[in-house]
Structure formats: C-alpha cells, structure tokens
C-alpha cells in the first residue's frame, strides 16, 4: 500500500493584481493553475496536496502579473542562491482540515465529498417554533380520530418534544407516521444496557394482531372461530348428475288440464248473441235473387249485340235499324253496352280492309327494261267508297291495270310531261266532310248526341266509310 498523504488546501493571494497563477512541484513549475478572483477582489483556489510521507514538504510559488514571487503568509525556504520558494508541512495541512469523516473522490483528485461545514452557535429558534406549531396542529387532529392507544402515543410524543427543547434539537417529521400511531412498548432501563449493544424492543403479540381480518373481502384469509359447526366443511356428497336431472325432470312433468269442456261452455254462453248476425245474411240472399231476375234481361241484349257484328257494306248498316226494333230494357245500361261494342267491331273491320287495300296496291316488279312508270294518283273518297260498295268495281280496276301495263310504252311521253301532285293537293283530297251523327236506335230519344273524341281508330273508321 502507498503511504502517500492527501489533504485539501486553499491557496490565496490578496486583492490588487489582475492575474495570479499557482505553480510548484505538482506541475513541474510550468504555471498551469490560475487562481480564481472572488467577489471581495482577492484570489483563491482549493486543490489536493499530496505528501509522500510525514517529513515531506509541498513547495510552490505564485506568478503575479507575469512576475515570479513568494507570499509572506506562507513559510519560505531557500533552495539555492537567489531562489526562494514557499512550502507546506504536514502540520500546516492538518490544522486546516474541516471535517474528519468526509469522504474523498479519487477521480476528482481527492476532493472532499460530504456534508458542508456547520456554522457555530446555537440552533435557530424560528425553525423550532414552526415545528412546534405544526406538531400541535397534527396532535389535535390525531386526538379526535385516535383510540385509547393513540392517546398514549400522543403523551409520549409530548415528552419527546420537551426533551428536544432542552437539548436544542427538533423533530423533523411533520406528517403522522405509523410509528407514532402504533402503541409504544413499555420503557426499559437504559442504564443497565452496555454502551456497545443495541436495544431490541420486545414483540407484543396481542390477540388483535394475530387474528386475521374476519370481514369478507378484507386482506388475508377468513378464519372462522367455529369451523366444526358449519356443515359445508364436514358434509361431502357424491351426486350423479344424470340421475339428479332425470329425477328432477320427472317431478316437473305435470299433466296438462283438458280444455274440452271449457270450450263448449264458452260457445254455449256466446250462442244467444249470434242471431244479430243473421240479418245481413238474409239481405244478401235477397240481393242474389234480384240479380238472378235481371240476368234474362241482360241475356236478351246479348243477341242484339251479336247481330251488329257483320258491317261489310252500307246495305248491312241500313238494315240494322229495321231489325233492331226492340223495346229498350233499362235504356241507359243497354246503350252503354252497345256503344262499347260498336267501337271495337268497327276497328276490327277497318283493320281487315286496310290489309286488303295494301295487298291490292302492291306493285308487280318485273325484269323489263322499262324505267319510267306512270305515277299512281291518290284515290279520292268517292273512288274508295265505290270500291267498298260492290266487288264488281274492284274487278274493273284490275282490268284497267292490265290495259295500262300494255300501253305503258305509248304513254311514256305523256307521263313525262305530267307533274306529280303536291303535298297540299294530296291533303286537300284526303280531307273529308264531317260525318253526320245518327242517333242509335237503342238509345233513348230524349238524350242529346254526345261528341266523341276522334282518335287513331276513329280516323281509320272515317276512311273506310
């Protein structure tokens, strides 16, 4: 082990110069440690001083504003002619040590690490007064909430405070702790104990501490005082689940009550109220009888409607009023039926005639070299009416068409000169005189003729009439 001694020492220089540097054997006289200027104006620095043994010395010197000089406040030593240094011995270093129990930090060059030096004098009274006030407030609160044991602990705390006031120390604990709230053990004679031995308090195992908390949900297990009296701890049963379920299900099966006689009694009780519903049944039968009486009248009208179907020529139309001289049965009803029937029949006849006309007007295309053909003039209303009146007219037209085909070559020059009719002329020719409204034989004479809306089918009927 090394026998080196290390001490912290503060080097100082009075105020006045600008810069002060400390140098010596610790840095081989290189002047590497400047002193720090304090608020007072002087220069100081604290550094560890190492000594190889008790007889060894620490030599140093100051460089003030670039001038090497020696301080009069330290011991001086002449090393050689004209050279003088300051030095420190072990006695000088020991006198200046502050705290003997302070630890040193080797990484910091042996600097002290411990409590700061305590200032001399009695302890401050202001802190003691504050602590006493806080302790009194705390005690007053604890007295209200504590039990008898807590009251004893408060009395012991008062005794401790009186002792603190005599010795000059104060209790730092302000808040209540478990030590103060727990009951204190009986005091023992301290004088009998040896100075080096520690006093161990006796353990008071009372019944309250040994027994666990009996409240369910509290800390620790619940220990029942009479476990032998509880059946759950002693009785053990072996139960088969299937047998138990079958036995319980058999017991639960209950015969359902018969609902037959109850329903019959309810029907018999409600039977006297049923005759009220027989009245509308009689009325419906009477209505059905009236409807059956009206059916022959409607059947008498149907053959008349069937007779009106064939309307190919105007001769048939003229013969209708002669054969339909029948007294109207409920005129308004029959007239509506006839009018509806006429509208459908006329459309069907017109569609047939249009198909026949389209077949007749089809041109016969051949392979002849004839190019120009005579244009077909639109048929007038008179020509169409004549074609409808008799089938002989249609035969004559076919003969004329054959003659025209033979004489087409002769009429080429004539047809080229002729002009085609304009669209206005065609429209004028197609315009027809309004048809006179004739009163239907089945409708009542008193009714005025109704104006019908001319639709697509109405226009077709006008073309074929």
Curated annotation (Swiss-Prot):
GO terms for cellular component: cytoplasm; nucleotide-activated protein kinase complex; nucleus. One of its GO terms (molecular function) is DNA binding. Cleaved in the vicinity of position 160 to give an X-DNA-binding N-terminal subpeptide and a non-DNA-binding C-terminal subpeptide. GO terms for biological process: signal transduction. Residues 337-363, 385-398, 404-428 have a biased composition (Basic and acidic residues). Gene3D superfamilies: Immunoglobulins. InterPro entries: AMPK1_CBM, CRP1_MDG1_kinase, Ig-like_fold, Ig_E-set. The modification Phosphothreonine is found at residues 182, 295, 366. Residues 160-161 are annotated as: X-DNA-binding. Residues 107-227, 247-275, 312-465 are annotated as: Disordered. Disulfide bonds: none annotated. The keyword Cell membrane does not apply. Keywords: DNA-binding, Phosphoprotein. Cruciform DNA-binding protein which exerts an enhancing effect on the cleavage of cruciform DNA (X-DNA) by endonuclease VII from bacteriophage T4. This is Cruciform DNA-recognizing protein 1. It comes from Saccharomyces cerevisiae (strain FostersB). The lineage of its organism: Eukaryota, Fungi, Dikarya, Ascomycota, Saccharomycotina. The gene is CRP1.
């Amino acid at each position: 082990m090394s026998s080196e001694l290390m001490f912290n020492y503060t080097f100082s220089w009075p105020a006045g110069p600008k810069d002060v540097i400390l140098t010596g054997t610790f840095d081989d006289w290189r002047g590497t440690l400047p002193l720090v200027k304090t608020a007072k104006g002087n220069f100081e620095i604290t550094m560890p001083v190492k000594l190889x043994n008790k007889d060894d010395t620490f030599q140093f010197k100051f460089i003030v504003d670039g001038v090497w000089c020696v301080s009069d406040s330290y011991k001086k030593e002449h090393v050689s002619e004209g050279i003088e240094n300051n030095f420190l011995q072990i006695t000088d270093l020991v006198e200046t040590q502050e705290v003997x129990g302070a630890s040193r930090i080797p990484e910091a060059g042996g600097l002290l690490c411990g409590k700061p030096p305590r200032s001399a004098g009695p302890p401050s009274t202001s802190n003691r007064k504050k602590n006493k006030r806080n302790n009194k407030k705390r005690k007053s609160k604890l007295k209200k909430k504590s039990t008898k044991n807590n009251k004893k602990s408060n009395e012991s705390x008062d005794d401790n405070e009186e002792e603190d006031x005599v010795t000059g120390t104060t209790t730092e604990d302000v808040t209540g702790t478990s030590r103060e709230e727990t009951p204190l053990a009986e005091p023992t004679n301290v004088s009998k104990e040896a100075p080096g031995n520690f006093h161990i308090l006796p353990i008071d195992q009372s019944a309250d501490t040994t027994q666990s908390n009996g409240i369910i949900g509290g800390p620790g297990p619940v220990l029942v005082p009479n476990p032998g009296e509880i059946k759950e701890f002693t009785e053990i049963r072996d139960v088969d689940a299937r047998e138990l379920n079958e036995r319980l299900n058999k017991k639960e099966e209950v015969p359902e009550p018969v609902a037959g006689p109850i329903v019959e009694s309810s029907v018999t009780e409600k039977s006297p109220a049923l005759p009220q519903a027989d009245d509308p049944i009689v009325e419906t039968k009477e209505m059905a009888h009236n409807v059956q009486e009206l059916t022959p009248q409607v059947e008498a009208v149907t053959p008349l409607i069937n007779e009106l179907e064939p309307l190919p020529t105007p001769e048939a139309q003229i013969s209708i009023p002669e054969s339909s001289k029948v007294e109207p049965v409920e005129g308004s009803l029959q007239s509506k039926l006839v009018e509806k029937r006429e509208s459908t029949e006329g459309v069907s006849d017109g569609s047939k005639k249009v198909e026949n006309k389209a077949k007749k007007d089809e041109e016969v295309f051949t392979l002849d070299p004839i190019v120009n053909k005579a244009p077909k003039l639109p048929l007038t209303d008179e020509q169409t009416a004549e074609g409808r009146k008799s089938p002989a007219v249609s035969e004559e037209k076919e003969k004329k068409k054959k003659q025209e085909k033979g004489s087409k070559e002769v009429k080429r020059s004539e047809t080229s000169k002729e002009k085609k009719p304009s669209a206005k002329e065609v429209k004028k020719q197609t315009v027809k005189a309004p048809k006179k409204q004739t009163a239907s034989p089945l409708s009542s004479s008193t009714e005025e003729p109704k104006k019908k809306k001319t639709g697509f089918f109405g226009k077709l009927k006008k073309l074929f009439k």
